[in-house]
Amino acid sequence: MATLDTLFPFKRHFITLGGHKLHYVHEKPAGINGQRPDAVVMVHGNPSWSFYYRNLVQALSDQYECVVPDHIGCGLSDKPGDDAYDYTLAQRIDDLEALLDSLDIRSNITLVLHDWGGMIGMGYAARYPERIKRLVLLNTAAFGLPKSKPLPLALKICRDTALGTLLVRGFNAFSSAASYVGVKRAPMAADVRRAYVAPFNSWQNRISTLRFVQDIPLKPGDRNWDLVQSIDASLQQFTQVPTIILWGLKDFVFDRHFLEGWQQRLPQAELHAFADCGHYILEDASDEVIAHIRRFIAETAVAKSADEQTSNPEENASAEITPAGSAD
């Protein structure tokens, strides 16, 4: 049976932010003709960690500089209490900015975003739109809950009730359940599932899993409401940025409502929807998704003209979602 070091064969890197160690993967080629390669920054959501991107890092790091942080409270990063760390969206964006600045990554960035990582990554992009070269969107969001999409009951319980706190922090229900329901083609291998849940192994170490859910704004006045609205408004700056969307249509949270939200906001995006895949699309359809991402980055290595990037956006915006089925 595979060990974590076998499944996740990367050197551990750490940066100290506000007294807390943030772990990140940093894999890159030796150099291409002395020129620094484009950076591919992969931002995970909840309840996962940098492990989610392990196969993508291995597929891209021969050509690109891959950076994958574990948010504070997740993965191999420190997991401080509320008295020592501000578990909020704004702080997550600050952390990502601090990490990238420490690595002197300030241009030619490809953002790969999943789950709440979309909000964090696009929050960073809103601050520095000129740094973003490409977007890769995987079952994620950078805007509020669509009006047509009620908050799923399971998330509402986790977000708003004492029972939810007990289930998430006492029994690791959120992370454990996600490792089962987040894939649809086939169950996760036991060693992979254990790797997903391993960092969240105690009441203290599950704090971020709960705080992420509690950080979701649902109405004006909620913490993050104004910030999420501003991130949403900033998306209009990226309608000429090459974008690819790879989406599992069996995601019970980030479903067609969110996908259609992206199509409305970024009509230039290339779309590949997988009818038989769930939330963890990099587990369900790893080979297909990675092949699409490699091709997409290679094809956009030379920036296209604005006219090419935005050709016929009205047609793209109104296009019907065509599921990929078992293969795309």
PLM regions with names:
Residues T3-K21:
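N-terminal cap/lid segment of alpha/beta-hydrolase-fold proteins
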Residues V25-I32, V68-L113, A291:
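Active-site loop/oxyanion-hole signature of alpha/beta-hydrolase fold enzymes
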Residues E27-K79:
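Conserved HGGG/HGGXW glycine-rich cap/lid loop of the alpha/beta-hydrolase fold
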Residues V41-G45, H114, W247:
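The conserved beta1-alpha1 loop
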Residues S107-K149:
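Conserved hydrolase catalytic core segment
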Residues K147-R211:
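Helix-rich cap/lid subdomain of alpha/beta-hydrolase
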Residues N205-Q264:
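Conserved serine/cysteine hydrolase catalytic core
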Residues A269-E308, N312-E315, I321, D328:
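Catalytic active-site module of serine/aspartate enzymes centered on a nucleophile-bearing elbow/loop
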